[in-house]
Amino acid sequence: MKERSITINAGNLSIDATLNETEMAEQIWNSLPLSGAANIWGDEIYFDIPVSATEHSEASDLVSSGDIAFWPPGDAFCIFFGRTPASTDDKPRAASAVNVFGHISGDEKLFRGVNGGTEISIVVKG
């Protein structure tokens, strides 16, 4: 399968990410472009998107910094870049199980400069 790359724009910040080869990644890819207002939860940005999905078999609340995921209870696109209020160590932890569908290609810590309410857009890279 051809590598699928996206660009995440948040204010003056543009960071690329690569989607994995999962059903969730396919659903996100087919829904692009996406946009919404950033919600901040610790070192996580999330926003509602017009996509619905259930938890996949590999869904987990344990994620890695730089993971991008879909949160089924909130129909939300999530970007993890550090500790969240649910973390028990230095790793991010989602509020509940998420479907990870990709990973940030650059420095995910740059998302710390994004404020709540900032418009986020997700587009096909290029």
Where do the model's predicted regions map?
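Compact, glycine-rich, soluble single-domain proteins
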Residues: S31, N39-S65, W71
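Short, basic/aromatic beta-hairpin or loop at an interaction surface
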Residues: G36-P50, T88-H103
